[in-house]
Design a protein with these regions (language model features):
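N-terminal secretory/targeting leader peptides
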Residues: 2-4, 9, 17, 30-155, ...
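Hydrophobic helical h-region of N-terminal Sec-dependent signal peptides
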Residues: 13-21
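N-terminal signal peptide c-region/cleavage motif recognized by signal peptidases
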Residues: 24-28
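Short, solvent-exposed loop/beta-turn-alpha elements that line the ligand-binding surface or hinge
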Residues: 153-176
Length: 389
């Protein structure tokens, strides 16, 4: 256990250094020498192999498991605690009878800037990792299309948008970034927690609203609010200090942060959901044993399905607990007022998406993205890209 602990500390330090130097090296067009040990364990060196060859054969039970290294999603939320971490540390060893295992750390505790995750996967600094789709808005805006603010008022709509976009997403990541997309996870609905009363979207005029993506910023600014970008870990402090009047975050993750004690009104319209891509550096992926790749191809879709089902449950549970449901634990039970989403607000959501969010995304993304949209999500949702933006 001591060896494992020391290895993890060195690995986390390596990730931090990789993130730091990766941006600098890539800015000059170089390939970064990995700051980590090789992505997966390799065969013994020739001298070791000679010794092993002379030694008596060991049983499979005595052999060390083949170990992967994974960077996961956000720490301290259900997706990581209940699904990602147990899958890699418990389910994988169980399904492989102990032959395969993995070490995993959440990216926000590994010194890895979220916006650099895809680049670090591309370089191989991170061999296997979870990429928050919203973090790609600046460098890779085209990949954020399925979860633009105001596009998906419910999970059925989100599934439809992702299904239409996924073939393009997987192909483009493989061909342009050398990254293999293996699963797409989802967080609970991202909704509004406010410290002051509101009756609907129009009441956001003049308020400072915490957001986590450019699309969310476009949406709230179109309503007359001021968008404030704040890391997830700083949301509660920003609400408590009065730096923001409202915060967009997950229904249950907001509860975990204690927002049910810091805010008074909950507006449950999903502005976004929060998609995350679990992906692998292609060389690291192809370097895995074939039977491990087969196992992961079979089991990761099952993990994905479980996470999506849990996100829907967590969305409902978060709303219930924030508003004082007796079925929730006392420490989770809030006293927030639940603001109903009116038909007028839903029409306004659709208008803002078509006239503000989608055109601004196209401005950031470029003209080719209009073509991508019109070949994927646009026809699936009946939302063609505007001809001028």
């Amino acid at each position: 256990m001591l060896h494992c602990s020391l290895w993890k500390k060195r690995w986390v330090r390596g990730l931090a250094l990789g993130a730091l130097y990766g941006a600098a090296w890539s800015a000059h067009g170089h390939v970064l020498p990995s700051a980590l040990p090789p992505p997966v364990l390799h065969a013994a060196a020739p001298a070791q192999a000679a010794v092993l060859a002379a030694a008596p054969p060991r049983s499979d039970a005595a052999a060390k498991p083949y170990q992967m290294r994974v960077v996961g999603g956000l720490a301290n939320v259900n997706q990581y605690k209940r699904w990602e971490e147990p899958f890699w540390t418990q389910t994988l060893p169980r399904l492989s009878a102990g032959r395969f295992s993995a070490e995993i750390v959440p990216f926000d505790r590994a010194g890895v800037p979220g916006q650099e995750m895809l680049r670090l996967l591309q370089l191989g600094v991170v061999p296997f990792g979870t990429v928050l789709m919203a973090s790609l808005a600046a460098q890779y805006p085209r990949y954020t299309a399925p979860d633009l603010a105001g596009l998906n008022p419910d999970m059925a709509s989100l599934r439809q948008s992702l299904a239409a976009f996924r073939p393009y997403l997987e192909q483009n990541l493989r061909e342009q970034q050398g990254v293999e997309a293996l699963a797409v996870y989802v967080y609970p609905a991202q909704v509004l927690f406010c410290r002051k009363p509101l009756s609907g979207l129009t009441d956001l005029v003049g308020r400072r609203v915490r957001v986590s993506s450019s699309g969310q910023a476009d949406f709230v600014e179109a309503l007359g609010a001021m968008a404030v970008f704040t890391d997830f870990s700083q949301v509660a402090a920003s609400m408590q200090s009065g730096a923001v009047d409202c915060a967009v975050t997950g229904t249950l993750s907001g509860n975990t942060l204690g927002l049910h004690r810091l805010s008074t009104h909950l507006y449950p319209m999903p502005l976004t959901w929060g998609l995350a891509i679990f992906a692998a550096n292609r060389r690291a992926w192809e370097g895995l044993p074939p039977d491990l790749r087969t196992l992961l191809r079979r089991e990761l879709p099952r993990l994905e399905a479980s996470i999506w089902e849990a996100a829907q449950r967590d969305t409902a549970e978060g709303i219930a607990c924030n508003t004082g449901a007796r079925t929730c634990a006392p420490e989770q039970r809030g006293d927030m007022a639940l603001v109903p989403v009116s038909a007028q607000d839903d029409r306004q959501r659709q208008t803002l998406f078509a006239t503000v969010v989608l055109p601004r995304w196209l401005q950031r993304c470029g003209r080719s993205c209009a073509q991508v949209w019109n070949q994927t999500i646009g026809p699936a949702r009946g939302l063609p890209a505007p001809t001028t933006y």
